[in-house]
Regions:
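The catalytic-center signature of Zn2+-dependent metalloproteases
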Residues: 84-162
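Metzincin-family zinc-dependent endopeptidase catalytic domain
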Residues: 3-110, 119-122
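A generic structural signal for solvent-exposed, polar alpha-helical segments
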Residues: 20, 44, 152, 163-164
Length: 164
């Protein structure tokens, strides 16, 4: 249940980045535009997004690996000691992969939620930046995971309706 809530909060976080907010409506799995699946982790894999077609429109399957034990010793140890850190990793992975579902590419800016570690970087520091905003689990929903660039890219892809 907890991870499912984190995924719902990640969807809500993206929806709030547009004006008006994107509307997220649950629907049948077979026709859903975005589907989120929890899967066993591949070594070092946080998640992935795969595009697909549904009724002639682009859709996405998001796969999240919630087991932090396979994400390297530093991440695994910190997640064992700090449940909010573990949930931060899962939440930010959901946000990142959902970003791909909305059409955002990887970036090389460490401050972006769409940053890719292919450019290197400190994995723990990346997640701790968000974790440090949290005092309690419910704070995950309230703290923004986005850089200005993340928000700007989404607003570019989904411009305000009725404005040109």
């Amino acid at each position: 249940e907890g991870d499912r809530v984190l995924a719902e909060w990640a969807l809500e976080a993206w929806a709030r980045q547009t004006n008006p907010s994107l509307e997220m409506v649950p629907g049948p799995e077979e026709s859903a535009t975005i589907r989120v699946y929890w899967v066993a982790a591949g070594e070092g894999m946080y998640g992935e997004m795969r595009a697909r077609m549904v009724d002639g429109r682009l859709a996405a399957d998001v796969f999240v690996h919630p087991d932090t034990e396979s994400l390297g010793l530093d991440i695994a140890q910190r997640a064992r000691l700090d449940p909010l850190f573990r949930d931060t990793v899962v939440y930010l992975t959901c946000v990142h992969e959902l970003g791909h579902a909305f059409g955002l590419p990887h970036t090389g800016a460490f401050s972006d939620i769409m940053y890719t570690f292919q450019y290197g970087g400190d994995f723990v520091a990346y997640f701790m930046r968000f974790r440090e905003k949290l005092d309690a689990w419910d704070d995950i929903r309230l703290a923004s995971p986005f850089s200005d660039a993340d928000s700007g890219t989404l607003r570019f892809l989904y411009p305000q309706r009725g404005v040109s």
